[in-house]
């Protein structure tokens, strides 16, 4: 498993986890999770994350889980399996949470994410 963190600014960071290859994950060939975390003095607070946890047919595309309503998933849809499009959609969700003034910092962090297919 590959994991690491990418700082956005002094208050937020991205944490990624790319698991080992698994044939159950059709398009990306592995499970992955990317978390947006708020940095606090003594701990980190979970804000949202993107993953591809569903392996059933037609649900291969990544989706976002938000902290305030954990049961709600925002699906990108099968038509957006292009990694660049997925990163742009994820960037928009991050900016909605941390504010438009942090868009440039968030964009720099999101561009450092590598595709799970590699």
Positions of the model-derived regions?
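Small/flexible residues
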Residues: 4-5, 19, 46, 61, ...
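Acidic, aromatic-enriched beta-alpha/helix-loop junctions
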Residues: 28-72
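Mixed-charge, Lys/Arg-enriched low-complexity segments
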Residues: 53-118
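Negatively charged, low-complexity tracts enriched in Asp/Glu with abundant Ser/Thr
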Residues: 1-38
